[in-house]
UniProtKB/Swiss-Prot annotation:
Location(s), subcellular: Cell inner membrane
Function: Fluoride-specific ion channel. Important for reducing fluoride concentration in the cell, thus reducing its toxicity.
Keyword tags: Cell inner membrane, Cell membrane, Ion channel, Ion transport, Membrane, Metal-binding, Sodium, Transmembrane, Transmembrane helix, Transport
The organism of origin for this protein: Vibrio cholerae serotype O1 (strain ATCC 39315 / El Tor Inaba N16961)
Protein name: Fluoride-specific ion channel FluC
Matches recorded under HAMAP family: FluC
Length: 126
């Protein structure tokens, strides 16, 4: 392991964190704060990108090193978020919005896994 790769992972993380903030702000502006659509969006998009990344590595279109670390750990690690997803659901529970909470859990899990599967299989060799 080199310090250069750590720097690239950190750079990917910085870009991912900024992207997450921008997506969240855009979603609040467009849809309001009634449902955590920003968290859902970054989780689904990030899962799709992860599927594409792994397919690119599997097809040998990208070298696993450093791309899995820079994009997978750095960028996507900062873009997607389980802690915010968890807190969004705690807040929905506290508001008594159990239907919204259930929808949020189901949508995040189903859409994120589906997006990862689609991204991966979209680029895999037949």
């Amino acid at each position: 392991m080199s310090f250069a790769i750590l720097g690239f992972i950190a750079l990917g993380g910085a870009v991912g964190a900024c992207a997450r903030f921008l997506v969240s702000e855009i979603c609040v502006t467009l849809f309001g704060r009634g449902f955590p659509i920003g968290t859902l969006t970054v989780n689904v998009v990030g899962s799709f990108i992860m599927g594409v990344l792994i397919a690119c590595v599997e097809n040998e279109w990208l070298s696993p090193y450093p791309w899995k670390q820079v994009i997978g750990l750095g960028f996507l690690g900062a873009l997607t978020t389980f802690s915010t997803f968890s807190m969004d659901n705690v807040l929905l529970m506290q508001q008594g919005a159990f239907f919204k909470m259930g929808a949020n859990v189901l949508l995040n899990v189903i859409l994120s896994i589906s997006a990862a599967w689609i991204g991966f299989h979209w680029l895999m060799k037949s």
